[in-house]
From Swiss-Prot:
GO MF entry, a single one: 6-phosphofructo-2-kinase activity
Annotated organism of origin: Rattus norvegicus (Rat)
Name of this protein: 6-phosphofructo-2-kinase/fructose-2,6-bisphosphatase 4
Annotated keywords: ATP-binding, Hydrolase, Kinase, Multifunctional enzyme, Nucleotide-binding, Phosphoprotein, Transferase
Binding site for beta-D-fructose 2,6-bisphosphate: 256, 263, 269, 306, 337, 351, 355, 366, 392, 396
Known tissue expression: Testis.
InterPro entries (alphabetical): 6Pfruct_kin (IPR003094), 6Phosfructo_kin (IPR013079), His_Pase_superF_clade-1 (IPR013078), His_PPase_superfam (IPR029033), P-loop_NTPase (IPR027417), PG/BPGM_mutase_AS (IPR001345)
Active site: 129, 159, 257, 326
Length: 469
């Protein structure tokens, strides 16, 4: 029996790993998040204007945010790339042989790209966004998944509420490239005829005929659900997420606590109280929220003194969430960047090399923070109007989710003090309004310096540190 290998600690993530032939051996857990032992193919099902693309985009954004490499494949976009000008609904008529041929070619081209992404490029989840309304088409896609070793999960969106369908048409389809420069009434009429082209051949997922498939059916954007044969952890995460999202119009307000005493001194972390300007900001925030006249607003804070002091000025009930606490800087808590460079120059350089994955000694990384904040995202998706009073790193993670930012961008998103970000979900994304509340504050944003080498001189390591007392 071979003797156990020696262990060494990864300097970036602080994870113990085997040491072999004088070098650390790369273990699967160091390569990235892996929640399934084989890739997953998510297949959308449903008539046009049922919110399939909305669901596809949200699901893709969520999975990428939690660290699961995911890509959306929209067959409609493949069709637009192949047929440069859209004329009318007649392209979708079931007896239009040329249209049928082109649409099949587009589906096959998309599936070929799915295969490349999942089998060659390291993808974990592909979302195949098309109508897929016939049992024959779904069987073809399922067989494609079987042949390539993928687990297939169907997501069907059924909608019979005419108001919801009409709203989908107005919101999404009239902004579609198919209807650029077309009269609104004419576009609506054409799109309704396009839906009719699919209705006669539409075969919904059936509890008897499709009992061996893994799927979720979503009725009228979340009024009820049918879930069948959830096969693994990633599918259960997908189901849980889809059962939490809604389309009710609302806004989410994100802001940091008022300026703290440690912000003034350029010290990170800790649990300080507000500075005089921070207390002034909390009064301005109270006035701003009052002026907005927001219906049924919920207010959330962390369990740290500075966010609670900020919320107290609002004179409204608020909930304290421990998971909203600032990133734990471990041994670097309450230090200035200059002190970190002086005491831990290697750590300071490693953090600049990969700020998202770098974990402070005895502390956290941004990657850890994202995992910690997932319950907050789930609850934000369930809620309507919410104000979250949090911290710089936490706000960056939440903002990255709503704005679909990559992990490399996330730690450098600008979240200045005394500024409220109003996020309003729209058709396929999020509208952002930045509102500065006219109270001066120190700058706490540090850009990545050009030189991130571990042997760099101190002045080059500290070149982007903001001014402080």
């Amino acid at each position: 029996m071979a003797s156990p290998r020696e262990l060494t600690q990864n300097p970036l993530k602080k994870i113990w790993m085997p040491y072999s032939n004088g070098r650390p051996a790369l273990h699967a857990s160091q390569r990235g998040v892996c929640m399934t032992n084989c890739p997953t193919l998510i297949v959308m099902v449903g008539l046009p204007a049922r919110g399939k693309t909305y669901i596809s985009k949200k699901l893709t954004r969520y999975l990428n945010w939690i660290g699961v490499p995911t890509r959306e494949f929209n067959v409609g976009q493949y069709r637009r790339d192949m047929v440069k000008t859209y004329k009318s609904f007649e392209f979708f008529l079931p007896d239009n042989e040329e249209g049928l041929k082109i649409r099949k070619q587009c589906a096959l081209a998309a599936l070929n790209d799915v295969r490349k992404f999942l089998s060659e490029e390291g993808g974990h989840v592909a979302v195949f966004d098309a109508t897929n309304t016939t049992r024959e088409r779904r069987a073809m896609i399922f067989n494609f998944g079987e042949q390539n070793g993928y687990k297939t999960f169907f997501v069907e969106s059924i909608c019979v509420d005419p108001e919801v369908i009409a709203a989908n048409i107005v919101q999404v389809k009239l902004g579609s490239p198919d209807y650029v420069n077309r009269d609104s009434d004419e576009a609506t009429e054409d799109f309704m005829r396009r839906i009719e082209c699919y209705e006669n051949s539409y075969e919904s997922l059936d509890e008897e005929q499709d009992r061996d498939l893994s799927y979720i059916k979503i009725m009228d954007v979340g009024q009820s659900y049918v879930v069948n044969r959830v096969a693994d952890h990633i599918q259960s995460r997908i189901v849980y997420y889809l059962m939490n999202i809604h389309v009710t119009p609302r806004s989410i307000y994100l802001c940091r606590h008022g300026e703290s005493e440690l912000n003034l001194k350029g010290r990170i972390g800790g649990d300080p109280g507000l500075s005089p300007r921070g207390r002034e900001f909390s009064k301005h925030l109270a006035q701003f929220i009052s002026d907005q006249n927001i219906k049924d607003l919920k207010v959330w804070t962390s369990q740290m003194k500075r966010t609670i002091q900020t919320a107290e000025a609002l004179s409204v009930p608020y909930e304290q969430w421990k998971v909203l606490n600032e990133i734990d800087a471990g041994v670097c808590e309450e230090m200035t960047y200059e002190e970190i460079q002086d005491h831990y120059p290697l750590e300071f350089a490693l953090r600049d090399q990969d700020k998202y994955r770098y974990r402070y000694p005895k502390g956290e990384s941004y990657e850890d923070l994202v995992q910690r904040l997932e319950p907050v995202i789930m609850e934000l998706e369930r809620q309507e109007n919410v104000l979250v009073i949090c911290h710089q790193a936490v706000m960056r993670c939440l903002l990255a989710y709503f704005l679909d930012k990559a992990a490399e961008e996330l730690p450098y998103l600008k979240c200045p003090l005394h500024t409220v970000l109003k996020l309003t979900p729209v058709a396929y994304g999020c509208k952002v309004e930045s509102i500065f509340l006219n109270v001066a504050a120190v700058n706490t944003h540090r850009d990545r310096p050009q030189n991130v080498d571990i042997s760099r001189p101190s002045e080059e390591a500290l070149v982007t540190v903001p001014a402080h007392q």
